[in-house]
C-alpha cells in the first residue's frame, strides 16, 4: 500500500533548489517519525493555487498552502501520509516580505504546516503561542531548517 515516495514539481514558477528542498522534506518526515508516505509537492503560482482553492474550498483567492489527504481521516494523529501539498511560491514571496523573513524560511514553514495537516493536526487560530499545531510547526522548523 504505502511506501516511501516523494515527488516534487513546479507549475508556472521557476525553482532552483530541488535537491536541498527534497532533503529538507525528508528531514521533516524523519523528525516527525513518518516512515510510510506517498507525498507529492507542487510549487506553483497564485493563479494555479487560486483555481484549486476555488474548486475545493469555494474561496476565489490565492492562498499559501493547500493539503489534500487521500487517507481516511481517523481524527487522530497518524504517522502515514498519502497526499499532496500545493504551495504558491508567488504567495510566499509576499508573505516573506510581510513577515520580514527569507523566502526559503517561509517555504519550509508552509511545507511543515501542510505536512502537519496531512497527518491530522488542525488549528482554529494563527496563535503561535497557544495553538499546539503551530508550536510543533515552529519546533520542527528550528530542528530541520535549511539554507537554500
From Swiss-Prot:
NCBIfam families cross-referenced by the UniProt entry: rRNA maturation RNase YbeY
Function: Single strand-specific metallo-endoribonuclease involved in late-stage 70S ribosome quality control and in maturation of the 3' terminus of the 16S rRNA.
Any one GO BP annotation for this protein: rRNA processing
Binding-site residues for Zn(2+), renumbered to this chain: 113, 117, 123
Cofactor binding remark: Binds 1 zinc ion.
Localization terms from the record: Cytoplasm
Molecular-function annotations in GO: metalloendopeptidase activity; RNA endonuclease activity; zinc ion binding
Species name: Borrelia turicatae (strain 91E135)
Gene3D superfamilies: Metalloproteases ('zincins'), catalytic domain
Domain of life per record: Bacteria
Alphabetical keyword list: Cytoplasm, Endonuclease, Hydrolase, Metal-binding, Nuclease, Ribosome biogenesis, rRNA processing, Zinc
Name of the protein in its database record: Endoribonuclease YbeY
Cofactor: Zn(2+)
Presence of keyword tRNA processing: no
EC number: 3.1.-.-
